[in-house]
Curated annotation (Swiss-Prot):
It is found in: Fimbrium. The gene is yadL. Keywords: Fimbrium, Signal. InterPro entries: Adhesion_dom_fimbrial, Adhesion_dom_fimbrial_sf, Adhesion_dom_sf, Bact_Fimbrial_Adh_Pro. It comes from Escherichia coli (strain K12). One of its GO terms (biological process) is cell adhesion involved in single-species biofilm formation. This is Uncharacterized fimbrial-like protein YadL. The keyword Methyltransferase does not apply. The lineage of its organism: Bacteria, Pseudomonadati, Pseudomonadota, Gammaproteobacteria, Enterobacterales.
Length: 201
């Protein structure tokens, strides 16, 4: 249409060809449609909580009343678990668990694997420490101790924790503190604050 109108007004053939070519290019162009993608990139994670044997959330492992004879015999053990659920976006389906002190380690030089009594009470127990183990029965089989003086991560497989719950069983055991004997143990309050750190990979 544009070409024929230009011919009637006496345009040269070379101009007509140029106009025709321009018209074809104009009609061949496509529309531009904008697209904006919006998302939030998140690190893979789980919901991890500390629970007792009744699956109730806890923040304290409570031994209740303990006798010095039980401490000396290493028979006062309390079991608990880390509970993992709603896991997503974790490539290798693994969790690394580390326990670190918030008070001191056992031993006269504070160089022991157990966690020392961090109570500030005037009537606190002396020469007592707590060990934390990676199994329900301390110091047996594949059990690994969470060391106070040299914290190291323990690995947990959480591949099924996306649709189910994964438990990591542990135990705590009261013992006579390193470099001490049962004769050094005195009755009183005991508290050993520590922090579990969980990282995923």
């Amino acid at each position: 249409m544009m070409t024929f109108k230009n011919l009637r007004y006496g345009l040269s053939s070379s101009v007509v060809l140029a106009a025709s070519l321009f018209s074809v290019l104009s009609y061949a162009a496509t529309d531009s449609i904008g697209l904006t993608v919006i998302t939030t990139v998140e690190m893979g994670t789980c919901t991890a909580t500390l629970v007792n044997d009744s699956d109730q959330d806890i923040s304290v492992v409570d031994f209740g009343d303990v006798y010095i004879s039980e401490i000396n015999a290493k028979t006062k053990v309390k079991t608990f678990k880390l509970k993992f659920k709603d896991c997503a976006g974790i490539p290798n389906k693994k969790a690394q668990i580390k326990l670190t002190k918030r008070a001191t380690c056992e031993g006269t030089a504070n160089d022991g694997a157990g966690f020392a009594n961090g109570s500030t009470a005037a009537d606190k127990a002396s020469a007592v420490a707590v060990e934390v183990w990676s199994t329900v029965t301390p110091a047996t089989g594949s059990a690994t101790q969470f060391s106070c003086v040299t914290p190291a991560s323990q690995e947990v497989t959480i591949s099924t924790a996306a649709n189910a719950v994964v438990y990591y069983p542990m135990s705590a055991r009261l013992v006579v503190e390193k470099n001490k004997t049962v004769n050094n143990v005195t009755a009183g309050k005991f508290s050993a604050p520590a922090t579990f750190t969980v990282t995923y990979n």
